[in-house]
C-alpha cells in the first residue's frame, strides 16, 4: 500500500491543491438526505408515523395560531408501489408565496428565534417529510391551500433540490372552490407518496390517541387501510391560552450567544444592554450584575482598619503643604473622623472619602484642597492604615478556621497572606482567583514551616472570609462594543450574570394543558373508574421556563395485563419512540409504586395494572436527546418536577384505591350479615308470633349505613321518604322517586319534573351524622313508584321500599 506521507513528500503542493479542489459546501438538505434516520425516517414503518406526526403538528399549530378549533383529517391508502398520505386541516391557509418555502426548504420557519412554547421550532419537520417522500417514491408532493375569504385555492407540486435546499416546483395552478379537494372553505391539504408499511400501526394509533388526550380541543379523524379512528373534541373544550414571546433569561445564555448579543445591541452601556435584552432584569438587578462583573473583571480591594494608636489628623496635616494651618486642621479632622467612622476602608473608598472631605473643608474655610493634595493625603493615610496588615488579616482568618488550629498556625497563615497583599501593589486589589492563590500559597508555606495541616475546607473558608471583607471597586465597566471585542471580559460578564439571583422567567410564554383539560382528555379517550391530573408551578432549567403536568386513569376498560400504559408528551406532542431513553421513563421507574397500591415486581421499573400514566413537559426549549425529538434528556430540574407531578396524581390514586378496598371489605361484611340477619329475623318472628320482620333498619344500624326507605300509608295515597344517617359524617343524598301519576303536596325542599307520562320527585337532603330527614307527598292509590338513590357509595347505602 502506498504511503500517504510519501505521496505528499513527492508533490506536496499538487496534493494540497487536489485535496482543496475536492472540498465543497453541502446544503442542510443534502446532509439530511444522507442522514434521514436522525429525523425519525429510518424505516418504512416509522417513516409513515413520523410523516403523519409532522403534518398533524403543523396543522395543530396553524389552527391554534389563527384561533380556530382544529379539525384534522388524515388518510392513508395503499397503492401498488407506494402508500399515499393525505393530511388536511381547517386552518387559515397559507399565502401563495409562502407555500413553496414552507414545504420545500429545510430550516425555514417562524419560531426558531422565538422564546415561547411551540410544537415545532427548527423549521425541519414537514419539509423533512417532503424530502423522505421524494427520496423513497421519486414523486413530488401536492400541496393545496386556501386562505380565509379567498374564492380560489393555490395548488403546488414540488420537491426539494437537495443541492441548494430550495423548492423545485413542477406544477403551480389556481383552482376554484368547486374544483378544490379541500373539504372546507379554508385550510391546507398535503398529499405525498412514500415507501412505507403499516407494521407500526400500533404506534400510529397511539400517536393519534395520545394527541387527542393533550389536545382535547381538537377533532382528529384517521382513515387507514381496513379501518378508521376518530377522536372527538371534548365537550366545552377551548383553545390553549395564547403565549407571549419573552426575552432570554440571564441564566440561560452561553458565551458565544452573549458576545453576539453585545455586538448587535443598540445599547451603549452594560446596564442598558442588560435591561433591554434580557427578561426579569430591572435597574436593581442590572446594578447587581454590574457589581458582580466588577468583582470578576477588576477584582476587589482589601479594607484596612486604622491602628488604635494612629494619629490620623497629624498624618493628613503632614501630607498637606502650603495651606493655612487652621484650614488644614479642619480638613485633617474631617478626614480622620470619616476614616474612623468607616471602621475599615479600601483604597478606592479612601479616595472618595478624601474628596468629600476636601469639598466640605473648602465650604467651611474657603481653601481649596486640590487633586494633588488629595493624592498625597490618600497615600499617607493608606500607609497608616496598612502599617499593621497582619492584625487586619488575622481576624477573618481566626474566625474562618476551627478551634483545632493553634494560635501559632493561625498567626503564621495570617502573616503570610498579609505579606502577599503587601507585595501586590498600592491598591490592594485582587481577583477572587488571585486571592485563592494567596491563601493556597500561604497555607502551603505554613504547613511546611509550622508542621501544621491546613485542609481544603479551611482554605476555602479563609478565602471566603477575606473576600467578604473586601470592597467592590467603583470602576466603570467597558461599553458593550468593547465587551463584544474582548472575549475574556465577556466571559466575566457571563459569570456575573450567572452569580446573581434573578427572578425566574415569566410563564406567559408557556401554554400548559391545565389539570381540568388534561382530565377531560383522559376521560374522552379512556373509559376508566378513576381520573386524576396535576399541573406543577413553573420552574427553570438553563434559563428556560418549563411546566410539568401528569395525569393518571385507572380501572374500567383499561387493560389490566402487564405494565401500565405510559404516555409521554413534550409541548403537546406525543413521544411514541425511544421510551427507554427518556427521562420520563427513568423517573417513573425510580418511584416506589407499591406505596401507591400498584404492583411493581422487583420494586423498580414501571408499575403493573390497569392504569394509564401520562406526563407532559411544556417549555420554550425542551431538551431532547436527538434531532428526532423522541425522548427528553435527563435534566435534573425537569426530572425533579416530573417526579413531583406524578406523585401528586398518584396520591389521589392511592386514596381512591384505599377507599375502594375499604368499601369492598365493607360490602363483604354486609353480605355476610345479610346472609344471617333474615334467618334470625324469621326465627324471632316465629317466637314472638309477629311474623316477618324487615331487617333493613337493623342492617343500616349495624353497618353505620345511610338508610333510605319509602313507605306508603294503608290506603296507598300517602308516600313517605325517609333518610337516616347512621354514620358520623354528613351526607348529601340524591333521592328520586319515579311516580306514574302526578304527585301532590310535595314540600318546598323537593321538586317535580314531568317526563314521558312519568313524574320525577327529586329530593336532595343534607343529613348530619346520627340524624334523619323526611319528605311526604300524596299520590293516587293505584300509582306505581320506583325509588332511585345516588350520592352514597353502594357499600354504605341501604334502601328499603315498602308498599304499605
From Swiss-Prot:
What is the protein name given in its UniProt record? Type 2 DNA topoisomerase 6 subunit B
Q: Briefly, what is this protein's role?
A: Relaxes both positive and negative superturns and exhibits a strong decatenase activity.
Q: Which reaction does it catalyse?
A: ATP-dependent breakage, passage and rejoining of double-stranded DNA
Q: Which domain of life is it from?
A: Archaea
TM region(s), chain numbering: none
Q: Which GO terms describe its biological process?
A: DNA topological change
Family annotation (InterPro entries)? HATPase_C_sf (IPR036890), Ribosomal_Su5_D2-typ_SF (IPR020568), Ribsml_uS5_D2-typ_fold_subgr (IPR014721), Top6b_C (IPR040494), TopoVI_B (IPR005734), TopoVI_B_transducer (IPR015320)
Q: Which residues bind ATP?
A: 58, 89, 110-111, 120-127, 629
Instruction: Recite the UniProt keywords alphabetically.
Output: ATP-binding, DNA-binding, Isomerase, Nucleotide-binding, Topoisomerase
How is this protein organized at the quaternary level?
Homodimer. Heterotetramer of two Top6A and two Top6B chains.
Q: Which GO terms describe its cellular component?
A: cytosol; small ribosomal subunit
Q: Which SUPFAM superfamilies match?
A: ATPase domain of HSP90 chaperone/DNA topoisomerase II/histidine kinase, Ribosomal protein S5 domain 2-like
E.C. designation(s): 5.6.2.2
Drop me one GO molecular function for this one.
Answer: DNA binding
Q: Spell out the PANTHER family in the cross-references.
A: DNA TOPOISOMERASE 6 SUBUNIT B
UniProt record similarity statement: Belongs to the TOP6B family.
Taxonomy of origin reads: Archaea, Methanobacteriati, Methanobacteriota, Stenosarchaea group, Halobacteria
Signal peptide residues on this chain, from the entry's feature table? none
Amino acid at each position: 500500500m502506498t504511503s500517504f506521507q510519501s505521496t505528499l513528500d513527492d508533490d506536496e503542493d499538487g496534493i494540497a491543491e487536489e485535496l482543496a479542489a475536492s472540498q465543497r459546501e453541502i446544503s442542510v438538505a443534502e446532509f439530511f438526505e444522507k442522514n434521514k434516520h436522525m429525523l425519525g425516517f429510518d424505516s418504512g414503518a416509522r417513516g409513515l408515523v413520523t410523516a403523519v406526526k409532522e403534518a398533524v403538528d403543523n396543522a395543530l399549530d396553524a389552527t391554534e395560531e389563527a384561533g380556530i378549533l382544529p379539525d384534522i383529517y388524515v388518510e392513508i391508502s395503499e397503492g401498488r408501489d407506494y402508500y399515499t398520505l393525505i393530511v388536511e386541516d381547517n386552518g387559515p391557509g397559507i399565502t401563495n408565496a409562502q407555500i413553496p418555502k414552507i414545504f420545500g426548504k429545510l430550516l425555514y420557519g417562524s419560531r426558531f428565534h422565538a422564546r415561547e412554547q411551540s410544537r415545532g421550532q427548527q423549521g425541519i419537520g414537514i419539509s423533512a417529510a417532503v424530502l423522505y417522500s421524494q427520496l423513497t417514491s421519486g414523486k413530488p408532493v401536492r400541496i393545496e391551500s386556501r386562505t380565509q375569504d379567498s374564492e380560489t385555492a393555490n395548488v403546488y407540486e414540488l420537491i426539494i433540490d437537495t443541492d441548494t435546499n430550495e423548492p423545485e416546483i413542477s406544477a403551480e395552478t389556481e383552482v376554484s372552490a368547486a374544483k378544490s379537494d379541500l373539504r372546507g372553505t379554508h385550510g391546507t391539504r398535503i398529499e405525498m407518496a412514500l415507501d412505507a408499511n403499516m407494521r407500526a400501526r400500533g404506534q400510529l394509533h397511539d400517536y393519534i390517541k395520545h394527541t387527542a388526550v393533550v389536545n382535547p380541543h381538537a377533532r382528529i379523524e384517521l382513515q387507514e387501510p381496513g379501518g378508521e379512528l376518530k377522536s372527538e373534541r371534548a365537550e366545552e373544550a377551548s383553545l390553549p391560552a395564547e403565549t407571549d414571546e419573552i426575552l432570554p433569561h440571564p441564566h440561560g445564555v452561553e458565551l458565544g450567544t452573549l458576545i453576539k448579543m453585545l455586538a448587535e445591541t443598540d445599547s451603549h452601556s452594560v446596564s442598558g444592554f442588560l435591561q433591554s435584552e434580557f427578561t426579569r432584569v430591572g435597574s436593581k438587578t442590572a446594578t447587581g450584575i454590574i457589581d458582580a462583573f466588577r468583582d470578576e473583571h477588576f477584582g476587589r480591594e482589601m479594607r484596612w482598619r486604622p491602628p488604635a494608636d494612629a494619629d490620623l489628623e497629624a498624618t493628613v496635616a503632614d501630607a498637606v503643604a502650603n495651606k493655612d494651618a487652621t484650614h488644614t486642621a479642619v480638613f485633617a479632622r474631617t478626614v480622620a473622623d470619616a476614616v474612623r467612622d468607616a471602621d475599615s476602608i479600601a483604597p478606592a473608598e479612601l479616595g472618595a472619602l478624601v474628596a468629600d472631605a476636601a469639598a466640605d473643608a473648602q465650604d467651611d474655610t474657603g481653601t481649596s484642597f486640590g487633586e494633588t493634595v488629595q493624592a498625597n493625603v490618600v497615600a499617607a493615610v493608606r500607609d497608616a492604615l496598612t502599617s499593621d496588615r497582619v492584625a487586619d488579616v488575622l481576624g477573618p482568618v481566626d474566625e474562618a478556621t476551627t478551634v483545632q488550629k493553634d494560635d501559632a498556625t493561625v498567626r503564621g497563615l495570617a502573616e503570610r497572606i498579609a505579606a502577599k497583599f503587601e507585595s501586590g501593589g498600592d491598591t490592594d486589589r485582587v481577583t477572587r482567583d488571585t486571592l485563592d492563590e494567596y491563601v493556597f500559597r500561604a497555607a502551603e508555606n505554613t504547613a511546611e514551616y509550622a508542621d501544621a495541616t491546613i485542609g481544603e475546607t479551611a482554605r476555602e473558608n479563609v478565602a471566603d472570609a477575606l473576600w467578604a471583607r473586601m470592597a467592590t471597586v467603583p470602576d466603570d465597566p467597558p461599553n458593550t462594543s468593547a465587551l463584544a471585542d474582548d472575549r475574556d471580559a465577556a466571559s466575566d460578564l457571563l459569570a456575573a450574570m450567572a452569580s446573581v439571583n434573578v427572578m425566574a422567567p415569566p410563564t406567559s410564554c408557556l401554554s400548559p394543558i391545565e389539570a381540568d383539560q388534561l382530565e377531560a382528555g383522559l376521560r374522552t379517550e379512556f373509559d376508566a373508574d378513576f381520573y386524576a391530573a396535576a399541573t406543577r408551578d413553573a420552574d427553570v432549567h438553563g434559563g428556560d421556563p418549563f411546566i410539568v403536568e401528569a395525569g393518571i386513569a385507572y380501572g374500567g376498560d383499561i387493560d389490566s395485563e402487564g405494565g401500565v400504559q405510559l404516555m409521554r408528551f413534550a409541548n403537546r406532542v406525543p413521544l411514541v419512540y425511544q421510551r427507554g431513553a427518556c427521562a420520563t421513563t427513568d423517573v417513573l421507574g425510580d418511584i416506589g409504586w407499591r406505596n401507591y397500591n400498584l404492583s411493581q415486581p422487583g420494586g423498580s421499573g414501571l408499575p403493573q395494572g390497569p392504569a394509564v400514566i401520562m406526563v407532559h413537559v411544556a417549555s420554550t426549549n425542551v431538551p431532547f436527546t436527538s434531532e428526532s425529538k423522541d425522548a427528553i434528556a435527563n435534566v435534573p430540574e425537569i426530572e425533579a418536577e416530573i417526579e413531583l407531578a406524578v406523585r401528586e396524581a398518584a396520591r389521589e390514586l392511592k386514596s381512591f384505591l384505599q377507599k375502594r378496598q375499604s368499601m369492598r371489605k365493607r360490602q363483604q361484611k354486609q353480605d355476610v350479615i345479610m346472609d344471617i340477619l333474615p334467618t334470625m329475623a324469621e326465627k324471632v318472628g316465629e317466637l314472638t308470633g309477629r311474623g316477618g320482620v324487615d331487617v333493613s333498619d337493623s342492617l343500616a344500624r349495624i353497618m353505620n349505613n345511610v338508610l333510605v326507605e319509602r313507605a306508603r300509608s294503608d290506603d296507598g295515597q300517602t308516600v313517605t321518604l325517609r333518610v337516616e344517617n347512621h354514620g358520623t359524617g354528613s351526607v348529601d343524598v340524591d333521592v328520586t322517586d319515579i311516580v306514574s301519576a302526578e304527585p301532590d303536596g310535595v314540600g318546598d325542599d323537593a321538586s317535580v319534573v314531568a317526563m314521558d307520562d312519568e313524574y320525577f320527585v327529586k329530593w336532595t337532603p343534607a343529613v348530619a351524622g346520627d340524624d334523619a330527614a323526611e319528605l311526604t307527598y300524596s299520590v293516587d292509590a293505584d300509582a306505581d313508584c320506583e325509588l332511585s338513590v345516588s350520592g352514597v357509595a353502594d357499600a354504605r347505602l341501604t334502601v328499603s321500599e315498602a308498599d304499605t
